[in-house]
Swiss-Prot record:
Residues 3-106 form the Thioredoxin domain. Induction: Expressed from 2 promoters, 1 of which (trxCp1) is under control of SigR. Dramatically but transiently induced by the thiol-oxidizing agent diamide. In an rsrA mutant expression is constitutive and uninduced by diamide. This is Putative thioredoxin 2. GO terms for molecular function: protein-disulfide reductase activity. It comes from the Bacteria. It is found in: Cytoplasm. Keywords: Cytoplasm, Disulfide bond, Electron transport, Redox-active center, Transport. Pfam families: Thioredoxin. Residues 115-134 are annotated as: Disordered. Belongs to the thioredoxin family. One of its GO terms (cellular component) is cytosol. Disulfide bonds join C31-C34.
């Protein structure tokens, strides 16, 4: 039995809305590093039954991959209380994945929302200035 949930454009929003803590593995069948990360992700899902571990097949769900700007796979994203708090491409080793989950569990989401609001306010004030030099 798998401990992960296959996410599609049909169930993605509801899964993220209904669950406080969702990990998302963006992957594809042809991707070698994705196949290496798969068992690590499954093991983490079994070790953390209180969290939702979702998988997005970027070949079957290109709209979801595009919506999140996924350009490299595998990419791991963590969404807490509907806020993306972590996103990183690459197959994380088991110890690194465990560490990231632990750090995400410890986040003070009130502080995170405050920081996001401040960033959005700053971006609004700066307009396109932040685009220079890229």
């Amino acid at each position: 039995m798998t401990s992960t949930v296959e996410l599609t454009k049909e169930n993605f929003d509801q899964t993220v809305t209904d669950n406080e803590f969702v990990l998302i593995d963006f992957w594809a069948e042809w991707c070698g590093p994705c196949k290496q990360f798969g068992p690590v992700y499954e093991k983490a899902a079994e070790a953390n039954p209180d969290l939702v571990f979702g998988k997005v097949d970027t070949e079957a769900q290109p709209e979801l991959a595009q919506a999140f700007g996924i350009s490299s796979i595998p990419t791991l994203m963590i969404v807490r209380e509907q806020v993306a708090v972590f996103a990183q491409p690459g197959a994380l080793p088991e110890a690194a994945l465990t560490d990231v989950i632990g750090q995400a569990r410890k986040l003070d989401m009130d502080e995170v929302r405050k920081a996001v609001a401040e960033q959005q306010a700053q971006a609004g004030q700066n307009g396109q200035e932040g685009q220079e030099g890229q």
